[in-house]
């Protein structure tokens, strides 16, 4: 089976759904952010602070191309879709799933999370603007799932149905 790339904005449920799908399909799950942290030997927050977003995006593209294109669930960072080369790679080499969640619901989820470099609690308007600027890129995915106020079980049922279509 082709690899499944799970995309969506931060806080949409990519990691949670990736792990659940991994168990369901008996496929390994690989998190691009985690792999970048391992390879660079520093937290993403530190990469952003010390090297900037452009360097991080370069690491992200390199990591994406190094991952398996078969029999893996790949959970991506929220901004991976900003580069056309990444969107093209994922679409050509796997099934791309977009997990949508209302940005105001995400903001509530992330309110206390200090590990997200692009989420600033004080500036919800900028957060929503960033979300909207990525929307068209996310929508290029093969499969769209709205995770807003849904349980993992509901999301998984919908996702399995769409994967099997």
Curated annotation (Swiss-Prot):
Keyword annotations: Amino-acid biosynthesis, Aromatic amino acid biosynthesis, ATP-binding, Cytoplasm, Kinase, Magnesium, Metal-binding, Nucleotide-binding, Transferase
Annotated compartments: Cytoplasm
GO BP term, pick one: amino acid biosynthetic process
Primary location recorded for the protein, binned into one broad class: cytoplasm
Enzyme Commission (EC) number: 2.7.1.71
A GO term for molecular function: magnesium ion binding
InterPro entries linked to this entry: P-loop_NTPase, Shikimate/glucono_kinase, Shikimate_kinase/TSH1
Associated pathway: Metabolic intermediate biosynthesis; chorismate biosynthesis; chorismate from D-erythrose 4-phosphate and phosphoenolpyruvate: step 5/7
Amino acids binding Mg(2+): 15
Catalytic reaction annotation: shikimate + ATP = 3-phosphoshikimate + ADP + H(+)
Cellular component GO terms held in the UniProt record: cytosol
Assembly: Monomer.
Role of this protein: Catalyzes the specific phosphorylation of the 3-hydroxyl group of shikimic acid using ATP as a cosubstrate.
Name of the featured protein: Shikimate kinase
UniProt source species: Bacillus cereus (strain 03BB102)
């Amino acid at each position: 089976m082709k690899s499944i790339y799970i995309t969506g904005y931060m806080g949409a449920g990519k990691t949670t759904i990736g792990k659940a799908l991994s168990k369901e399909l008996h496929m390994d799950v690989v998190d691009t952010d985690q792999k970048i942290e391992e390879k660079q030997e520093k937290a993403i927050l530190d990469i952003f602070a010390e090297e900037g977003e452009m360097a991080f995006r370069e690491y992200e593209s390199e990591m994406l191309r190094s991952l398996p294109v078969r029999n893996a669930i790949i959970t991506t960072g929220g901004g991976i879709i900003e580069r056309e080369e990444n969107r093209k790679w994922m679409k050509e080499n796997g099934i791309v799933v977009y997990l949508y969640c209302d940005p105001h619901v995400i903001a509530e989820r992330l309110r206390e999370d200090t590990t997200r470099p692009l989420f600033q609690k004080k500036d919800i308007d900028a957060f929503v603007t960033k979300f909207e600027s990525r929307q068209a890129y996310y929508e290029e995915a093969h499969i769209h799932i709205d995770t807003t106020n849904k349980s993992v079980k509901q999301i998984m049922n919908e996702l399995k149905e769409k994967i099997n279509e």
